[in-house]
Amino acid sequence: RDTGEIFFQNERVFNKSEKLVPGTKGIAIVHQDFQLEPGYTVYDNIRHHLIQFQKSYQESKTEEIITLCHLESIRNQTSKELSGGQKQKVALAKAIIEEPPLLLLDEPFSNLDNISKAEFKTILKNIVKKLTISLLFVTHDSIDALTFSDEILIIQNGELLKKGTPSDLIQKPPSKYAAQLLG
């Protein structure tokens, strides 16, 4: 089945023939491939998204986001010099530079070692708190879903099975599939 619509801030943003994010005002995404400008430094990759603003604002906002995403030590490196975890943090910084109300993350923890994962989760929590934005992330890792989410949507074969808090879903899984998925 491929039916239904998605609304964001009371406007329809998705149907079968449309894409959810590109061009949808107020929604930003961190892709798995990061989409960084190869010859740009970390600083320029982030600042590039503020080109329409005055230079003083570009600089102050870029500095704020660099600090928020813990990128100070690599600010002058180009994207080709960065590790995967560093690239992911730069992609995150690019996505939040205009403070979207909603941030989508595609498997944000899947390619990170435990130390990098813990740091990235801390950064995300700080972003949510400081910028008051919402996160929606896709994961196949039940531990990440259960330990990092306020609410979980369990989807099977493209259909929503259940929405609930991690503790509610663990205590009363809606199906055998959900119980297996959540461990």
Where are these regions (language model features)?
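Conserved ABC ATPase signature
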Residues: 78-82, 86
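Conserved ABC ATPase "signature" region
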Residues: 57-74, 125-126
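Conserved ABC ATPase "signature" C-loop
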Residues: 157-158
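ABC-type ATPase nucleotide-binding domains, specifically the catalytic core motifs of the NBD
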Residues: 16-18, 35, 40-59, 68
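ABC ATPase "signature
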Residues: 163-164, 172
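A short, proline-enriched helix->beta-strand linker immediately N-terminal to the Walker B motif
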Residues: 97-101
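ABC ATPase NBD coupling module
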Residues: 12-28, 52, 169-173
